[in-house]
Amino acid sequence: MQTTDWIVVGNGIAGAALSYQLAKQGQSVLLIDDANPDSATRYSYGGIAYWSGTDAISRALMVAGIERHRTLSEELGAETEFRELDLLLTIPAGADVDAASQPYDKFEIPPRFVSPADACELEPQLDKGAIAGALTVKHGHVHPTKLVAAFNHAFRQMGGRHLISSVTGLVRVGDKVTGVTTPSQAYVGNRVAIATGGYTRRILQSINIHVPIYHTHAEVVDVSQVDQVDTKIRALIMPAIADRFEAEAKASDPEVEPLWQNGPHQILPPILDAGVVQFQDGFTRIGQISRFNTAVELEVNAAASAAKMRQAIAQQMPVLSAVSGTWHRCLVTFSRDGLPLLGPVPDLSGLHLFSGFTSPFAMLLPVAQRFAAWATGTPDPLIDKMQVSRFV
């Protein structure tokens, strides 16, 4: 049976980028892709918040990340649809503008406040009377699935093996993981990297391994070209007053860790952050509801959720009031400290994590590049700071 240097499980942005970078380092790589349509990469906005660094690590990674995105289509030989557009963080009418703006002062490039009239110059579909203004900054953007497809294309061009199959388990011999099983056969690898985002905890729990990695259930409404809005939406719209990051901090607090290990439990009530982005082909995505529940499978009233998201964005953008669209959901991963969980799982050789990215489109690309170099012998203190062992 053929043994590869690395088996990478998961083909979202994390697995696609990691498999490509490992192959560039001369490693033999098997990428296993379950082709699950409900992935966080597929249903993301595709935004690149390169302006949002708050410390030396995040600033350096986001600068490196946006530089990678600007040249990536040429490098990979396939289009990612990278562009820069205006991000508008809208402030609802009647809200305290100063209070809404203050949390953004910490960022490397703080978004600037604009009046309702100026916001409507940037995005004519906004209802001027519905907002007290907005914070705006230039924001990177890619087509998420085309980005993954571009990585996969370049990976296969270098001889990487891309298998469409689910992974049913990890092959474990004592304290060593030696491969994975699929419905048809087992595959052997010197090292296995789990890049499965919100499904990572479930995979690890199946072998009685517990690490502090978490997920939300994110919901969006996709408006297809058949169902398309007639008018172009120029900007990416998101709320300036958003509770998701504070909620993630509460949901990952060590005091609630037992709930994650003995679920299912609702950790916090759902959060609705009204937003919308239109891709270059006119496809439109409306979002988003985040549910903080430890279950991987969750029963949701899809019609009611979709209606709430459409109504919320239509209050600011009446052009969207009549669209229908299709409701989707996915698991979105996050960690306790905002940094990803990388590297070897303690006390179990052969198994690595590459998951838990809070801002994957902004910082994952340079992290994948550095991780692949680190994994093949190049010391990197930044990768050391992201290792799973920091929580053990």
Predicted feature residues:
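Dinucleotide-binding Rossmann-like beta1-alpha1 core, especially the glycine-rich loop
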Residues: 46-122, 271-274
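Active-site substrate-recognition segment that forms the wall
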Residues: 20-21, 48, 80-82, 198-327, ...
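Glycine-rich FAD pyrophosphate-binding loop
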Residues: 24-42
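N-terminal Rossmann-like FAD-binding beta1-loop-alpha1 element of flavoenzymes
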Residues: 4-30
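Short beta-strand to alpha-helix junction loop
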Residues: 60-63, 89-97, 134-153, 299-305, ...
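Helical element adjacent to the flavin cofactor pocket in flavoenzyme catalytic cores
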Residues: 134-183, 187-190
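Flavin (FAD/FMN) cofactor-binding core of flavoprotein oxidoreductases
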Residues: 118-121, 141, 293-295, 299-374, ...
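Short hydrophobic core segments
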Residues: 7-9, 187-199, 368
